[in-house]
Amino acid sequence: MNSWMVDIADTFTRCFIREDRYKLLISGIGVTIKVSIVAVILGILIGFLIALCNLSKNKFLRAIGKIYTDIIRGTPSVTQLMIIYFVIFATVDIEKWIIAAIAFGINSGAYVSEIIRAGILSIDKGQTEAGRSLGLNAYQTMTRIVIPQALKNIF
C-alpha cells in the first residue's frame, strides 16, 4: 500500500477511533435533527400566518406579509442566523440550537408562505363563491372548503 494511504488510514484511526471524535459527529447529528424538526414546525406555522396575511383584504396585513417575505427571501440565511444570534439574542441566555431553529424557522416561513399562498390561490374562485352562497362566512368557507382542497396542492 502507498505510504500516503497508510498515513490517511492512520490519521483517520487516530482522530475518529482512538480519540473518540466519532461521538462528536453522532451528537452533531442529534442537534441537527432537533434544529430541523423545530425549524420545520416553526416555518409551517409562520408560513401559514404570513400566507393568510398576503391573502388578506386588509392592506396593512398584506404590506406586513409582503415586507416579511421580501426581506427574508432576499437575505442569505447565514446572515439572518448571525443577526438573530449576535444582535437579537445577544443578551438572552438560551441554548444555541434553539436560536438556530428559530432563525431557520423564520427563513423557511417566508418560502412556506409562498407555497401555501399558491396552493390556496390554485383553488377555483367558484369554490369560494359556492361556500358563500350556502351561507358560510369567509372563515367557514376558508376552513371547510378552500383549505382542505388546497392542502392537496400544497403537499
Which residues fall in each region the model found?
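Transmembrane alpha-helices and adjacent helix-loop boundaries
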Residues: 1-155
